[in-house]
Amino acid sequence: AMMILASKWIEFLLSNSTEQKRFLSNTYGNAGQERIKLIIQTLQKFIDTLGDKHVFITRCPGRINLRGMHIDTHGGFLNLMTIEQELVLIGHPRDDDKFCIYNLETKHKPFLSSFRSLQKEYPLQSSWKDICHHAQNRTDTSSHWHQYIIGTLLRFAQQTKRPLTTGIEVVVGGDIPEGSALSSSHDLCIVLLQALMYN
């Protein structure tokens, strides 16, 4: 992924240059020009919230599972197709283990935590089953989207068998309707995993 200033990304996306058209075509096919608005809104929220920093962009399209019923999380087979709506993440690496994750939708509270504090509540040496059981029994359900973030961070650390010593600050934005079975929560996990791999 390419890291340039967030403001330069906006300038590039608005440029209508040959490079911009090629970039959008390679990323989105014929729908490129329609997708710019969401990316620019998310970049602008990043600048307004975290400053004009060198950032990377990850994305994941929404998906339709023709069998439905969360069968993938129960070991079943999928019959998928993607849709144009997507989730976009604008990210910047940090030098410490803090994670500052904001959503374009203000109804979602920011997730602000360090990996060290997460490990106190969810020790990495615990089994994944124990971690999930503990998460299900939490009394604070005020921000369910935090659970997807916590699960992604812990699963990544457990799979790579190392604590996350460098955090990230990100803004996510999407146009996938929540609760519509188009995998908006799945996409949040995927763009966050992409950001962690980049980091």
Map each language-model feature to its residues.
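ATP-binding N-lobe of GHMP and related small-molecule kinases
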Residues: 2-186, 190-199
